[in-house]
Design a protein with these regions (language model features):
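A structural signal for short hydrophobic beta-strand segments in well-ordered beta-sheet cores
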Residues: 133-137, 514-517
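A generic, well-ordered mixed alpha/beta core segment in the N-terminal half of proteins
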Residues: 99, 103-125, 141-142, 147-150, ...
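Flexible, small-/acidic-enriched active-site or ligand-binding loops
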Residues: 148-151, 175-208, 566-595
Length: 770
């Protein structure tokens, strides 16, 4: 889960740089040796090696002796130094002092100081505090106090901002006279801190008088992004180290990583690491490209990464047990570094407050939307915009705004879905010959999102058909099946339902007992019961999994069928949900005859077909990779309008939700543009986090206007906030429960042992748990 910046520089070049820094750290700055060394001397160990390889000046222009690389490369160096808690003044010298000099635009000072910093001959830092500078002869004298200055006790040059009659100005202090340094004992022993007191200390002016404010704001923003990268790799490395311990440690006769309680905790830590890594990556990407949302993205990363690093370090201690609580173990060092980092450039709470305020005030930086597709331009989306302008009428918009619940489509909607399907926009990722436009996943997702934004997309009742049945038939169907089922599905002529779950086979879907017995070469006789089938009461067809060979292990004797719901013997009974609606159904299949031509995929190979359907379901529940305003932004707007934003608890919950939602967007964005990424991993993470965000939204929305959501007129519709509250658990269950998603992440992404299943390899008719 390293910060891959493939979109900024050559992936191979970044990988080479990462390997180079990792080797230098392993040779000169190993964690095992650094922890026992003298703190001051330890911070200079390996400094010459970093200088010889040009790493100290990696982002310094070549004219000053640097490598002339960019922010992406500097982030890689920060990442690899942080992975092993390397105790160097790299942050202070290369990320603060050098950047402050460059931001000043003072070519004379840069030409004198930067080559020495790059060569490792000079260490420096940037101090922030309250100080005043007065002119004296050909110089300036500075008086003031600076607290918790990174490597301030040992830096040979201290850059600082001091007030003057012309405004805040940058100065360099290199002498000892008038400079009092207090080396502090620190929570994080790998990074030195000092308090500085200057009393009429001589300082050299750097840059123009009054120019320090904007220059240092840029430096601080860049340093905050780089520190987020450091926090992200700490969060990720804590997962890596803990995973190995859970695999190595054995108790009760097995690896402790097999225990679900530990698996779920590590899965949650892995999710946090993925989200904060995605947010750090996105922040670096946007900042390097000087994007409009760069400052907002950096603030999201600082909030997400600062929190996740501390949480994951604490979780590493917990999951290591007693050994993790010892001085000799390295776990506490990661906790110390992560916590100390939170206070360098603003706490997570401070960053969350900044984000929430920006959204509440509707600032442009908070409303910027960035898409994988639209960043590079999309002729297909341009075509969609033109098509919508020509085809969307007030009648279509009005019919979508007030659809008849649970009924078949109105004539207006039938006409609209037919036009949408004929143009290929209902199913844009499908091949053109089957009613699509042949777009890729990201571009197609952006097209669907645009239809949703306009309020003219296909309804929720079509979810199974468009997002599950269609892609599954495309992948597994014969040419005849594709020709038969796909075009009318694209035109909105048929609805589909999913017939997987049974009363005795929910999360353990492979235990299904609905049987399909051959009548002859052309027909099957199906008997059984299905449950939790959304919209089965209005469906024309169903995706059916049935057992065709009970002598095979439970995963091996299943076959997949496309069931005509109008067949004799199919009985659908609606189930009323806690909202009062009846989307769920139980379906009874009694001597239903299914033609063999409706069998999808190989005989007894239906489990693989079903898994592909479930993967489509998880992906489709989370939306396309877009970074921008989402549900949290909408809720903040509602909170401001209702006055609930003044409630500290509501504000805090919404700000946490805002950070998590933007971090999830960033992680999804990263997965879409990065090479060699496993889509299954990010889809499971997106499903888990999206479900959690949906639940939190339901809990918060009812609190925004409680006077309306707990009681309403007898003849009125249920308020949206009440419905949202009652539906909050919907996606924590639908499409695979959150607990199952944690199992998937732990076992398939992290590689922890699978849950014990005594029936896994037994013939189904000989299983133990019947």
């Amino acid at each position: 889960m390293a910060v891959s910046l493939d979109a900024l520089s050559s992936a191979s070049e970044l990988d080479e740089l990462r390997d180079l820094v990792r080797k230098v750290v392993a040779k000169h700055l190993p964690l095992g040796e650094m922890r026992h060394a003298d703190p001051a001397s330890a911070r200079l160990a390996g400094w010459d090696a970093l200088a010889e390889l040009g790493l100290l000046g990696i982002a310094v222009p070549e004219r000053y002796g640097g490598s002339g690389a960019g922010l992406a490369e500097q982030a890689i160096v920060c990442e690899e130094l942080a992975r092993e808690l390397a105790a160097t003044p790299f942050l202070a010298t290369a990320c603060l002092a050098a950047e402050a000099l460059l931001a000043s635009g003072d070519d004379e000072a840069n030409a004198e100081l930067l080559p020495r910093l790059v060569a490792g001959q000079l260490t420096a830092t940037l101090a922030e505090g309250a100080a005043r500078a007065e002119p004296r002869a050909q110089s300036w004298v500075i008086t003031g106090d600076f607290h918790h200055v990174p490597d301030g006790a040992d830096a040979q040059v201290v850059l600082l901002s001091a007030e003057t009659d012309g405004g805040p100005t940058l100065y360099a202090v290199s002498g000892h006279e008038g400079v009092h340094r207090e080396r502090l004992s620190t929570l994080d022993g790998t990074r030195g801190l000092a308090n500085l007191r200057l009393v009429s200390a001589a300082g050299r002016q750097i840059g123009g008088v009054g120019a320090a404010g904007p220059a240092l704001a840029r430096v601080r923003l860049r340093a905050t992004a780089l520190l987020a990268v450091e926090q992200a790799v700490l969060a990720e490395h804590c997962v890596t180290l803990t995973r190995q311990y859970l695999l190595d440690r054995r108790q009760f006769g097995r690896q402790i990583g097999a225990f679900q309680a530990l698996k779920h905790r590590l899965a949650d830590a892995a999710v946090r690491a993925e989200l904060c890594t995605g947010s750090a990556w996105y922040a670096i990407r946007q900042l390097a490209g000087d994007a409009a949302d760069a400052e907002f993205a950096v603030t999201v990363a600082a909030a997400a990464c600062g929190e996740a690093a501390v949480q994951n370090a604490a979780e590493m201690i917990q999951l290591h047990g007693g050994i993790g609580y010892t001085w000799e173990h390295f776990a506490h060092l990661y906790l110390r570094r992560a916590k100390a980092n939170q206070y360098l450039f603003g706490t997570p709470s401070a960053h969350r407050n900044r984000l929430g305020t920006a959204v509440a005030e509707n600032r442009s930086t908070a409303t910027e939307t960035v898409s994988v597709v639209t960043q590079g331009g999309s002729p297909a989306l341009d075509d969609l915009h033109r098509w919508l302008a020509d085809n969307v009428t007030d009648e279509v918009i009005g019919d979508h705004a007030a659809p008849p619940p649970g009924a078949k489509y109105s004539p207006v909607r039938q006409g609209w879905y037919r036009r949408l399907g004929e143009a290929g926009w209902a199913t844009p990722t499908w091949p053109t010959e089957y009613g699509g436009r042949g777009l890729g996943r990201d571009e197609g997702g952006a097209a669907v999102e645009e239809l949703r934004r306009r309020g003219v997309d296909r309804p929720e009742e079509d979810f199974v058909g468009v997002w599950l049945a269609g892609p599954t038939i495309l992948q597994w169907g014969s040419d005849e099946q594709r020709d038969t089922y796909l075009p009318p599905l694209a035109r909105g002529e048929h609805r589909w339902c999913q017939l997987f779950s049974e009363p005795g086979a929910g999360s353990d879907l492979a235990s299904l007992s609905t049987s399909a017995v051959r009548i002859d070469d052309d027909r099957w006789l199906v008997n059984g019961q299905k449950i939790w089938s959304s919209f089965a009461n209005t469906a024309d067809f169903g995706l059916l999994m049935a057992r065709t060979d009970p002598t095979l292990p439970k995963h091996g004797g299943i076959t997949y069928f496309l069931l005509d719901m109008r067949s004799p013997g199919v009985e659908v009974r609606p189930l009323r949900q806690m909202t009062g609606d009846a989307e769920f159904n139980e379906v009874f299949l009694t001597d239903v005859v299914v033609p063999d031509s409706a069998r999808l995929g190989p005989l007894n190979g239906g489990w693989k077909v079903g898994i592909s359907t479930l993967m489509q379901e998880r992906n489709s529940l989370t939306g396309p990779p877009v970074v921008g305003p989402g549900v949290a932004d909408q809720l903040i707007g509602e909170a401001v309008a209702s006055g609930a934003w003044q409630d500290a608890d509501v504000r805090d919950r919404l700000q946490h939700m805002l950070v998590d939602e933007r971090a999830l967007q960033s992680a999804s964005f990263r997965a879409s543009v990065a090479a060699n990424r496993d889509p299954g991993a990010i889809d499971s993470i997106r499903k888990l986090v999206s479900a959690d965000l949906h639940e939190r939204a339901g809990r918060i929305r009812v609190d925004l206007r409680p006077e309306l959501t707990i009681g309403w007129a007898a003849d009125a519709e249920m308020p949206a906030g009440t419905r949202s509250f009652l539906e909050m658990k919907k996606y924590c269950i639908a499409g695979g429960t959150s607990e199952i998603q944690r199992n998937i992440i732990a076992e398939r992404v992290l590689g922890l042992p699978r849950e014990a299943d005594p029936d896994r390899n037994k013939p189904f008719n000989q299983r133990i748990s019947r």
